Every structure is written in C-alpha cells, then in structure tokens.
Amino acid sequence: MTIADFRRIALALPHATESAHMGHPDFRVNGKIFATLLPRDDEDWGMVNLKPEQQRQFVEAHPGVFEPVKGGWGRRGATQVRLRAVDKPTLRSALLTAWLNTAPKRLVEESGLAVAE
C-alpha cells in the first residue's frame, strides 16, 4: 500500500479529517488523532492508535507488517504499519479499529461500524 492508499482509507471513515502533528499528516475524529502518516526517505510507515491487546493481535497475526512504536506510546498501543508490506483489507481493519477506539461512542453507534464484542 502507499501513502495515498492510507490517506484514502482513513478519510473514508465517518467524520475523519486530515490535519498535522509534529510535521506529519494525521487523521482525526472529533479532534482526536486515530492515525498518522510517517513518510521516511527509506520506507513509508503509518501509525494507528490501538489498545495494547489489539496491538498484540495485529503484531502476532502480521509479523513484519505491524510493530509497536518505541517507548511509552508503543506500550500504550501506538502501532507502526509498514505500508509496502500491508494489504488493503488488513490496513482497512487496522484503521477502522483505531477509529473505533477514538471516535465518540455516539458516533460509533450512529456509524453502524461497531463490532459486537
């Protein structure tokens, strides 16, 4: 996948907007960041805000695609996505999960995107 793919999928989520944080494009719902793009000279990455258990599941299911962000943010669930290695359904799932974690409960319910636990 590419930066353009990441952006397109993120912005397709309800009420998602693009902004910037620390010089990187980010994607927000209700003013809160759920994903960030991390373009680099050698390889492009994205970041999704997952819960620690969700992070563990993505990392275990897709080794070489997902990895925790270094430091405290990573321990809280911030997860890097190697864009060249991820497929569209997996990227969409990660972005949707991050959006569901971040969006207000009312918006999640209205969207019909909530997954039964």
Give the location of each predicted region.
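Charge-dense, helix-prone N-terminal extensions
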Residues: M1-E117
